[in-house]
Every structure is written in structure tokens, then in C-alpha cells.
From Swiss-Prot:
Sugar attachment sites: 19, 25
Listed transmembrane segments: 44-64
Location of the protein in the cell: Membrane
Extracellular topological intervals: 19-43
Membrane topology: Single-pass type I membrane protein
Major localisation: membrane
Spans annotated as Disordered: 75-115
Record keyword Transmembrane helix present: yes
Protein name: Uncharacterized protein C11orf87 homolog
Length: 153
């Protein structure tokens, strides 16, 4: 009996609803595009998701590369400052000690003093020897050599 009822219901239902289509005003059945949109939207979602993941990977790699180059520059600057501090300041102090050994006063050294960032301060009242200038030019060459070796490595 249930088979008869289901057959009667099927016959009473218009063919548009049985085929999952809708009837328009002209009573013709129009196919629905919903299954196509569902498959297209899921494909679109997968493409968007893959694009987002790819963009995140590219962004993280570029950020890492920029940070790495920034840290490398900082490391080079720090090494240069450390080199200047370690190699220029002791020479300046040695210049003071040499000046005192030659009979100079504690307040005014007799040789040029090399300060940080390679500025040379001369005492106008004292005589200037050639040796301190040679030491300063040697420091300039040593600093250039260090900068070249740091840049190359």
C-alpha cells in the first residue's frame, strides 16, 4: 500500500520539483545552477586558501631576509666600533705615556692624540714629530683593511 501512495505522490508532484528544478512563469522548468556553484565555490575556497598560505610563506621569508640583513649591518657596525675602541684608544693612551716620558706635562701631550672616529687633536704649543703621523696613517690603512675584510666576510 505504501508503494501506491509514493507512486501517487510522485505523479502529483510536478516534474520540475522532482528534477530539482523550478518552474518559471511560462511553466517551463529551469535547471538550477546550485550544484555547479557549490563545486565552483569549494574550488574557489581551496584556491584562496592555497594563495593565502603561499603569501604567508613569502611574507615570512622576506621578513626573515630583511631582518637578517639588518642584523648583519648592525654586527658590522658594532665590530667597527669595537675595533676603533680597542685599537684607537690604547694608541691614544700610549701617546700620552710617550709624551710624559719625553718630559711633557700631564696636561699637554707632545704627540698628536688619536681619538675615537679617527679625529686627530694636535697641541699647538708642542712640536709635532713625523712618527706619530706615520702611526696615524698606519691606523688608517689598518682600518681600511679591517673594513675590507669585514665586508668580504
Amino acid at each position: 500500500m505504501s508503494a501506491r501512495i509514493s507512486k501517487q505522490l510522485r505523479l502529483s508532484v510536478p516534474p520540475c520539483l522532482a528534477n530539482r528544478t523550478t518552474a518559471s512563469n511560462s511553466s517551463s522548468c529551469v535547471t538550477e545552477v546550485e550544484p555547479l556553484l557549490q563545486s565552483f565555490s569549494s574550488t574557489l575556497v581551496l584556491i584562496v586558501l592555497a594563495t593565502v598560505i603561499f603569501c604567508l610563506v613569502v611574507l615570512s621569508l622576506s621578513t626573515f631576509h630583511m631582518h637578517k640583513s639588518k642584523m648583519k649591518k648592525r654586527k658590522i657596525e658594532k665590530a667597527q666600533e669595537e675595533y676603533e675602541r680597542d685599537h684607537c684608544s690604547p694608541k691614544a693612551e700610549r701617546g700620552h705615556l710617550h709624551g710624559m716620558g719625553r718630559g711633557g706635562t700631564h696636561g699637554s701631550p707632545t704627540s698628536p692624540t688619536i681619538q675615537r672616529k679617527e679625529h686627530i687633536r694636535l697641541d699647538l704649543g708642542a712640536s709635532v714629530n713625523e712618527e706619530p703621523q706615520l702611526e696615524a696613517s698606519g691606523l688608517d690603512r689598518a682600518t681600511e683593511h679591517l673594513q675590507q675584510s669585514v665586508v668580504l666576510s
